[in-house]
């Protein structure tokens, strides 16, 4: 049975207490995921992991050596080392699907003004590595980004989702956002569920959902809409 291993390295390991809840926690308990958390300070001298930046500037920069020690201790030849970073490649549906087939991912969660750039050069000469960005904004550290990346790809691991068909119609499949969903009651505070969803005609319902996907995607993500239209017409 395929068991993916993910290691998270951070100076705030408490961030990852959430790995024991929801679908990820269930997958972990069922033996589908091997998740391990490491405190970067354990790989440093006297717990010191940062220093002032060469060339001046605000804040502190994380030193390369503790990261190198952690990577050497945790990673193997099969590992992919991921640095969550605004300067990384954009996270996407396709990238999430690709990550789900990895045997071992090591997430290096930086803080402060970033990590000494030499760690990226050093890692790239020894292992497969990648920077990944979850959006055009800056967070206080890489922990939240690492969790978001994990949430995105574990859904593709067989056995994690109770109903695998959920993957087929969710947002970003075929470059379209998801259609609106409704549940009981049929009328809630004067707002009604669209009649077509109560009709029982599955062909019409499928057509309505696709139309709504097109409308929503064109309005909020015209870039995805253009890609979908291009691929459909090709």
Curated annotation (Swiss-Prot):
Any single GO BP term: tRNA N1-guanine methylation
GO CC field: cytosol
EC numbers for this chain: 2.1.1.228
Residues given in the record as S-adenosyl-L-methionine binding sites: 110, 134-139
Domain of life assignment: Bacteria
Family, per entry: Belongs to the RNA methyltransferase TrmD family.
Protein name: tRNA (guanine-N(1)-)-methyltransferase
Encoding gene, per UniProt annotation: trmD
């Amino acid at each position: 049975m395929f068991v993916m291993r993910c290691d998270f390295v951070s100076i705030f390991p408490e961030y990852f207490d959430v790995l024991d809840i929801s679908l990820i926690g269930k997958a972990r308990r069922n033996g589908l995921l091997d998740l391990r958390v490491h405190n970067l300070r354990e790989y440093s001298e006297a717990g010191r992991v940062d220093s002032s930046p060469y060339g001046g500037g605000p804040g502190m920069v994380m030193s390369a050596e503790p990261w190198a020690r952690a990577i050497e201790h945790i990673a193997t030849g099969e590992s992919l080392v991921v640095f969550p970073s605004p300067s990384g490649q954009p996270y996407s549906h396709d990238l999430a699907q690709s990550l789900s087939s990895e045997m071992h991912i090591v997430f290096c969660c930086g803080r402060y003004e970033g990590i000494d750039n030499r760690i990226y050069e050093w890692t790239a000469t020894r292992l497969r590595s990648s920077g990944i960005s979850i959006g055009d904004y800056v967070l206080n550290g890489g922990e939240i980004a690492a969790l978001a990346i994990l949430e995105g790809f574990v859904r593709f691991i067989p056995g994690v989702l109770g109903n695998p068909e959920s993957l087929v119609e969710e947002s970003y499949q075929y470059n379209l956002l998801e259609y609106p969903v409704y549940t009981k009651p049929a009328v809630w505070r004067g707002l009604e569920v669209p009649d077509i969803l109560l009709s029982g005609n599955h062909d019409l319902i499928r057509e309505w959902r696709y139309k709504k996907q097109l409308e929503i995607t064109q309005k909020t993500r015209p870039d995805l809409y253009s890609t979908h239209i291009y691929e459909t017409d090709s």
